[in-house]
Amino acid sequence: ERKRVIIVGYRKDLGKVFTPPKPNLYKPTLKDAIWSLRLSKPALDKNYTNGDANLAAPNHEYMTGGFSTIYMSRNRVRSWEEPSFTIQAGGRHAPLHPKAPKMLFIEQNKRIFVPEQEHLYRRLTVRECARIQTFPDDFIFKYHNIADGYKMVGNAVAVEFARQLAQVIYKDIILSSDSVL
């Protein structure tokens, strides 16, 4: 949902003008991205990593701990059929897993978890956030504290987006000239 500005420029002597790839109008859903991921684990005490040997998939662990008043001021749950919220560079702000029901509106800027369903509310794992950012499952994030994993994923440019830009640049610069560099 957050807008981004990407600037691509070519040297004048190349005589090229960057034309961005056509936008993909399909918006992948949470089901598309993370449905197949199962058996997540909470982080260890103080949000230290479990280590990949103890996880069903690399980095498939989630931050534990409370939620701030600001976090609880909005619904943080999207359904399986919706695209994810923007992945931010911090685990405390990670979206909640779609298995949980939408948060209940109490009053302006105040929501709560559905009573007797609180056990369903957990943050997305680092791996789930990475999948949403289109990282392949064999890309391993190395960290001791899980907050650093969320930070790496949230600060990253989505892999598929970067790939599409790189393909255009490669075609324009590398494939169309013998001596570019």
Please annotate each region the language model reported.
Residues 1:
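Short acidic, glycine/serine/threonine-rich loops at helix termini
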Residues 4-181:
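S-adenosyl-L-methionine-dependent DNA methyltransferase catalytic core
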